[in-house]
Structure formats: C-alpha cells, structure tokens
C-alpha cells in the first residue's frame, strides 16, 4: 500500500483496505504480509500531498536512471534521509502497528536501491551516509511498531557503494541482524 493511500491527509489514516485484507485472509486461515510503499516507479506520488510542501523539503524526490537510451525518469521516492519526512513515515508505521500489528504475519519495507543520475546536484540534504542512516532508522521504527511480526527490509543496492565494495549495504544487513 502506498504511504499516501494509508494517510490521505495529515493524521487522517485509512486502514480499511488493510483491515479488509486481514479479514479476508483470516477467513481462509491465512495472515497478511504487507508492504508499505514510500516509492513509486511511475508519475504517481508515494507520499501524502501535505508532505510535498517546503516544510518537508518537498516530501519526495524524482528518481532518475541512466541506461543505454540515456537518463530517464524512474518514479518518486520519499525523502528517507530527511528527519521530518522520516518522522511522518514512522508515525504512519506506529499508527498502523497499533491497529494491525497483532493480526499480520509481517511487513516489508521497500527496496533500498535508488538513483539520482540526472547530471544535476543530488537532492538537498542527501548523501549516501544520510540515506543509509535513514534506512536504518526506518527499519528500527518498523520493528518497534510491529514487535510480533516479521519485518523485512528489501535491501538490494545502496547508493554510494561501488561493487564489489559494499559498505553501505553491509551496514544495512548488520543493522537488520542486530
């Protein structure tokens, strides 16, 4: 589920689709494993409109990928490295956890891979270090919000790593194992 779908306006949450899915699965002896998305791979914004303000640094950033056909728009990503934006995502996780944590099997946080390869300066406040720290803080927040559920961070690539040297990705794995 997209962040913006679960919190359509500031502090106004809509967990009905999640609760409905839980009920449907429970009727069949199953439990929900869900993903809360703060990233898209399209023009659709992942964050609530109120986050797209200056107070939140714009809330989300355009992602860019370099490929054989040049630099192309690749969707949007919440500013995970920004404490204000991360705080709102953490609040969403806490509130969602209060409602459904005991009734779900697990929660998955979206992939860590991102790129801002558009030939311009990176977004304000962004650095590989700040991004990695933001990912770790979100992982910890999810664990607190869903203490009895499996929490998975989809860690597939970290900006700033230059394979085979992957210190940022290894730091994410170490945090997950702690």
List where the protein language model places each region.
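Glycine-rich, flexible loop motifs
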Residues: 161-178
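Surface-exposed cleft-lining segments at the edges of enzyme active sites
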Residues: 5-8, 75-85, 116-130
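A short helix->loop->beta-strand "cap" motif at the edges of active sites that frequently abuts
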Residues: 27-30, 147-149
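Conserved, mostly hydrophobic/aromatic
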Residues: 25, 96, 142
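Active-site-adjacent "subsite" loops/lids of carbohydrate-active enzymes
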Residues: 16-18, 23, 39-95
């Amino acid at each position: 589920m997209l962040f913006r779908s679960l919190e359509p306006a500031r502090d106004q949450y809509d967990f009905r689709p999640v609760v409905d899915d839980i009920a449907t699965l429970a009727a069949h002896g199953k439990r929900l494993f869900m993903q809360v998305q703060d990233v898209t791979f399209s023009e659709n914004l992942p964050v609530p409109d109120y986050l797209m303000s200056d107070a939140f640094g714009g809330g989300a950033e355009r992602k860019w990928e370099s490929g054989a056909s040049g630099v192309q728009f690749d969707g949007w990503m919440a500013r995970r490295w920004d404490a204000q934006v991360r705080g709102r995502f953490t609040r969403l996780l806490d509130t969602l956890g209060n409602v459904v944590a005991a009734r779900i099997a697990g929660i998955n946080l979206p992939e860590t891979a991102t790129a801002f390869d558009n030939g311009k300066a990176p977004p304000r406040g962004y650095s590989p270090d700040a991004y990695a720290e933001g990912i770790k803080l979100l992982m910890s927040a999810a664990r607190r919000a869903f203490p009895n559920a499996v929490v998975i961070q989809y860690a597939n690539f970290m900006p700033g790593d230059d394979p085979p040297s992957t210190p940022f990705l290894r730091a994410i794995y170490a945090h997950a194992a702690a």
